[in-house]
C-alpha cells in the first residue's frame, strides 16, 4: 500500500485470493486502475474529474486525459454549465473512451462513455440529487440526519471514496436540502434538479 504522486492511495494485492480481494476493495471503495503500460485507444476506462474549463474536462486516469467540450455529449453549453447542470463535483469517477495519444496522427479525441452519459442523464430524470465531495458516506448520512432531513432522502449513494450522491425523495427540493445541510458539511456540493 502506498500513496501516488497525486495523493491517491495505491494498493497492490497479491496471492491466491488476490482477485477476490481486488473485487471487494473496488466494490467497497471504487477504483482507478493504474495504467503503467499506457492507455489503449478505443478502450473504456474510469478517471476522476480533475478540472474543467472553457474547452473541456481533464480526467485523472493515472495520466491526465482531456475530454474536449464537444465530446462530452451532455447537451449544449460550456463545460462549466454542464458541471452545474449535472451537479458534478471534483474527483467524481467518470467513465470515458480513450481517443489516443496526443502525438499520434490517427488519434481521435477522448469522450465520455455512452454508459456514463446515460447515468448522468438518469440523474436529471429522477427526483433530484445533491452531490458531495470530501465526505464519507457515513458523514454525509449523519449530516442529513443532524439537519433533520432524514425523511427527505431515499439514500446516500457512494460514487467514489469521498464522493457521494444524496438521492432526494419525491417532493424534496435539492437546492433547499443543500441549503439546510451546507452549514454542517464543509464540502463541495452541487444539486442535480
What are these regions (language model features)?
Residues 21-41, 83-85:
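Short boundary/loop segments of OB/S1/cold-shock single-stranded nucleic-acid-binding domains
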Residues 27-31, 67, 77, 150, ...:
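Generic alpha-helical propensity signal that fires on short helical segments
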Residues 34, 64-87:
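Beta-strand/loop nucleic-acid-binding surfaces
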Residues 39-44, 76-99:
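Short nucleic-acid-contacting surface segments enriched for D/E, G, S/T with interspersed K/R
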Residues 44-46, 64-66, 106:
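Well-ordered beta-strand positions in beta-sheet-rich domains
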Residues 54-59:
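Short aromatic-glycine-enriched beta-strand elements
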Amino acid at each position: 500500500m502506498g500513496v501516488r504522486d497525486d495523493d491517491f492511495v495505491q494498493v497492490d494485492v497479491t496471492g491466491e485470493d488476490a482477485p477476490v480481494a481486488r473485487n471487494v476493495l473496488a466494490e467497497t471503495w471504487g477504483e482507478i486502475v493504474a495504467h503503467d503500460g499506457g492507455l489503449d485507444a478505443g478502450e473504456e476506462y474510469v478517471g476522476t474529474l480533475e478540472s474543467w474549463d472553457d474547452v473541456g474536462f481533464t480526467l485523472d486516469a493515472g495520466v491526465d486525459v482531456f475530454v474536449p467540450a464537444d465530446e462530452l455529449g451532455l447537451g449544449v453549453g460550456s463545460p462549466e454549465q454542464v458541471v452545474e447542470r449535472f451537479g458534478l463535483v471534483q474527483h467524481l469517477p467518470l467513465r470515458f473512451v480513450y481517443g489516443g495519444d496526443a502525438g499520434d496522427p490517427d488519434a481521435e479525441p477522448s469522450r465520455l462513455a455512452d454508459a456514463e452519459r446515460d447515468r448522468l442523464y438518469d440523474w436529471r430524470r429522477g427526483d433530484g440529487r445533491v452531490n458531495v465531495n470530501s465526505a464519507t458516506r457515513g458523514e454525509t448520512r449523519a449530516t442529513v440526519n443532524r439537519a433533520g432531513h432524514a425523511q427527505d432522502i431515499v439514500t446516500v449513494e457512494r460514487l467514489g471514496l469521498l464522493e457521494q450522491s444524496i438521492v432526494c425523495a419525491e417532493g424534496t427540493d435539492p437546492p433547499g436540502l443543500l441549503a439546510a445541510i451546507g452549514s454542517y458539511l464543509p464540502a463541495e456540493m452541487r444539486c442535480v434538479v
